[in-house]
Amino acid sequence: MKCSIITPIGPGHEQLFLQCRNSVNKAITQSMGPFTEITHRPIDDTQGLKGRSASRNSEVAEAVAHGADWIFFLDADDLIIIDAFEKVMDAVKHYDAIWGAICELKKGAYYPQIRDEQDVPIRNVEDVILMDPFFSLQMGHFVKAEVALANPFNVELNTGEDFDYYLRIWHKYSCVKLKVPIFINRRGMHSKGPKSASGTDWRRNVEEIVRRFKREKQIQLNK
């Protein structure tokens, strides 16, 4: 199986991407897990004109055209965990998309930590909706290439596009959130381009996206 790692490089992330790329190279050297070929596909958007969503979408199409079976979405300011590929050895046989526990490296810290309040399992889209989005899912994840191609990111959204995508994937496909991390989210490193947004903007948009999704899909929650 072939896996393509897709990384948009936004304004100010050029140096951070070098560290991101280094983490990918180390992980590949450590173990390719279930994959016979792993390629890293960065997208240069350092002018910030294209945006994360359009960058990811175009590169997914390129990856599929080159025979990718799986995609790993990794932001330029984040790091893949060295044994990430090993950790999904079994999961790729059973799921269409695979997330891990949220692990973060705070600005100025030396060591990453698992984010608190992740004890409640995520089993379905209802669980995603019920959970505070800060503690549920993040961008670094594996997804079957055909699933990613069929579910592009919404290019009209400058923030919250991640959660819009998560909801669609968890609603339609077999997904899992592992109890172990597969990437490290580096806090306080956000890009500052024309399509960037603050954490407050993100939460406000995500809450509206969740409300709209529940209404459109007529999802009834038990809690």
Predicted regions and their residues:
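Glycine-rich, basic loop-to-helix element that forms the pyrophosphate-binding segment
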Residues: 47-63
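Conserved donor NDP-sugar-binding/catalytic core segment of glycosyltransferases
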Residues: 85-114
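Catalytic donor-sugar/metal-binding loop of nucleotide-sugar-dependent glycosyltransferases
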Residues: 167-184
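A recurrent flexible, glycine/aromatic-enriched loop bordering the glycosyltransferase active site
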Residues: 123-143
